[in-house]
A protein has these predicted regions:
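FAD-binding core/adjacent interface of flavoenzyme oxidoreductases
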Residues: 1-8, 62-140
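Beta1-alpha1 glycine-rich phosphate/pyrophosphate-binding loop at the start
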Residues: 2-75
Length: 140
């Protein structure tokens, strides 16, 4: 049995990325697994409503590159959300049926855009803005 702890961070956004940087800055040497339901690496959300729409080709929103995550020794699971947390077994179950074990679990999932009643009836020109795809849909 390994004495190196595994920290699983659920949520690959700004909070998840910040947690990784803080863990490593504070000399945490254990295993870190970052789990996100989006296919993108961690990125900043504030520019989604501004820069990404106005200057999509020039806007850099990525917080941690694939290389930086590798340098930090982080295993990344993308496009695969968590469907269940089993705190007794210390595991999370993913959408694809896989299970991931943890010693410590950090939930950094953020929020979701609230869809008002009858939202879909408003037509294809009404949007929510929560993720990169939402922002890209608004680019002229």
């Amino acid at each position: 049995m390994s004495n190196i702890e595994t920290v699983v961070i659920v949520g690959a956004g700004q909070a998840g990325a910040s947690a990784i940087l803080e863990l490593r800055a504070n000399k945490y040497e254990g295993k870190i697994i970052l789990v996100g339901d989006e296919t993108h690496l961690p990125y900043e959300r504030p520019p989604l409503s501004k820069d990404v729409i106005l200057n999509p080709a020039e806007t850099k929103i990525e917080i941690l590159s694939e290389q930086k995550l590798a340098d930090l020794g982080v295993e990344v699971i993308r496009g695969n959300g968590v469907v269940k947390i089993n705190s007794e077994a210390k595991t999370i179950d993913l959408q694809n049926g896989d299970s991931v074990a943890f010693d410590k679990l950090l939930l950094a999932t953020g929020g979701a855009a609230r869809r008002l009643p009858n939202f879909d009836a408003l037509g294809k020109h009404v949007y929510t803005l929560r993720n990169l795809e939402d922002s890209q849909a608004l680019v002229p």
